[in-house]
Amino acid sequence: MLDAYTEAATKRGVQHQEFRGSWPDVAANVPVADVVVCHHVAFNVAAIVPFLQALNDHARRRVVLELPMTHPLSNMSPLWKKFWDLDRPTTPTAHQLADIARALGFDGHLDVWADETWGQRVSLPMEERVRFARIRLCLSEDRDAEVAAALIQDLDATPREVCTLWWDV
């Protein structure tokens, strides 16, 4: 993903610099920038307050986070219900992240939009999709046919609701 960002920025003639590592662990090595961008990682951050604060501390003008409105694997919730009769959590959400940003004193704006390419970006063979879902669902290989049938019912090719959370510094 970072390589794709680098390529796109270079192609557009945008000055950019990437830093690999966990945020805010690498913050001390990262210079302040006009715009700080964070793409599809917020749901995996254990300590969100220091994460957001470090983003803000490194931006001169703006902080931009792009993320889905709900957890990236929430599309599997119906499968958890089907196979385990479990109702998966519906939180956290992007709205809650925006509330946290505002509670920190940032004037967070949440722009919601549809990602029309969701479900079409990576064309995995069905057996790989089944394997991934089976492992995520903690099922044994002998359930592959059931998993495949469930996936065929919901190929998840509909647009996904995502957002851009941003604030000026």
List each language-model region with its residue ranges.
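Conserved SAM-binding loop
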Residues: 2-9
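Short alpha-helix
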Residues: 88-111
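Conserved SAM-binding strand-loop segment of SAM-dependent methyltransferases
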Residues: 11-25
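Conserved Class I S-adenosyl-L-methionine
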Residues: 30, 107-169
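Class I S-adenosylmethionine-dependent transferase superfamily signal
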Residues: 54-56
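Local beta-strand N-terminus motif with an aromatic residue
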Residues: 15, 32-33, 60
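A short SAM/SAH-binding and catalytic strip from SAM-dependent methyltransferases
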Residues: 24, 33-49
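Conserved class I S-adenosyl-L-methionine
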Residues: 61-96
